[in-house]
Amino acid sequence: ISTRPSPTTADDVLHDMDGRIAAVIDGGPCQIGLESTVVGIEGEEIVIYRPGGTTKEALSVIAPTTVDSALAKDGAHPKAPGMKYRHYAPSAPLTVYTGEADKVVEEILSFAEKTDKKYGFFVSEETARLLPKGLPLFVWGQREDKESFAHNLFSGLLYFNRHPVDAIIGEGTDTAGLGLAIMNRLTKASGYHIVVEKR
């Protein structure tokens, strides 16, 4: 279970635990959708060991803030729990496209025409409107709404465990604000299969 996406609703918990617990107290979906930010103090700096709901920008108001360089390296050893191995992974392989928006959309749409595999799409509202009807699809929110993306991130990945596909094609975001935590989780969930599209 520790390698799977984190459940953020009572339904997700019940599905994940699959009869191993008697009941779940449902307090509603998690407000933020991501785990907490884990930090340490090194010298006079705040170091983010695991990005979460409290952003680097918010912490920088308190003191100079950096991000643990190990977070960006496959095989490195970050200090925070859950950052040391493949984590948050859905059942199907995930590839995430990010970067220049038009190129990202073009690449994602190309998979809608392929018939070699059953593809699921984890995308923004704007991209979803361009996809053919009837494809396995989870919409995480409007492209610029990172709060919705964070809120729906794990539910979206778990959706494809309940609606199996051969591969998941995801749309990422930039790393400003909550985007740092979102892309950290997607990087882990995809096993570092992140494609950056440029002009």
Sequence positions of predicted segments:
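Active-site-adjacent structural elements in enzyme catalytic cores
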Residues: 1-199
